[in-house]
Amino acid sequence: MKILAIEASSLVASVAIMTDDIITAEYTMNHKITHSQTIMPMIDEIVKRCEADLKELDAIAISGGPGSFTGLRIGSATGKGLAQALNIPIVHVPTLDAMAFNAYGYNGLVCPIMDARRMQVYTGIYKVSKDIDIVQEGCAISIEELINKLNELSDKVLFIGDGIPVFEEYIRENAKFDFDFAPAHLNRQRAASVATLAGIYFSNGEVCSAKEHLPEYLRTSQAERERAERLSGKQE
């Protein structure tokens, strides 16, 4: 089994190749260059360095959201184009699931938090000590609502994601549970985690075609919200 994984849901751009249960290579950047400029060159480079043949791929894994609307569209379009050209399926991997999987083996709750602006986060709650168990499905909620939920669960929590620097002060002031912030090598999206989960899903037959794949946004875009607000104002 050989899978190419693409992660473009945030500022991070990451690609990886997994052969059976080995990550052959991973290329990750966390830098302000648009994914339209980075993803395909990164794929070309990783394929070249690994002396890989794209025709040997069994599937394309895509980090499918939530996250940056532009990034998700670029990741999806890139993956769909490759899958269609190679006539292979796509494995859709929820971004929050893959982020939680970074901390596989953690004894406690894992809580990815992606900054969704307006004091909201894209988040979910997981247990990953052995398998990946979903305690709270991925959603877009206020940081206040998330911390209240975690206070109710009253378990140790590991936070992961770009929401940490945004909401660290709020968490420290309002959390009534023990918590940690993930270290640098775990605290952002990684295509290696997308690939690893994709291998599990692929083995279970959880695939879709290029035509069927759509990102999960979890909420409308800012442009759509602003348009709705303008229309609402006109109606009043």
Predicted regions and their residues:
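DPxDG-like acidic metal-binding loop motif
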Residues: 62-90, 95
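Acyltransferase
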Residues: 180-236
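N-terminal beta-alpha supersecondary unit
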Residues: 1-64, 188
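Phosphate-handling active-site elements
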Residues: 48-55, 84-94, 206
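Surface "functional belts" at beta-alpha junctions
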Residues: 22, 89-188, 203, 222-223, ...
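Residues at secondary-structure transition points
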Residues: 30-38, 69, 73, 77, ...
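Conserved hydrophobic/aromatic positions in well-ordered beta-strands
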Residues: 16, 122-126, 216
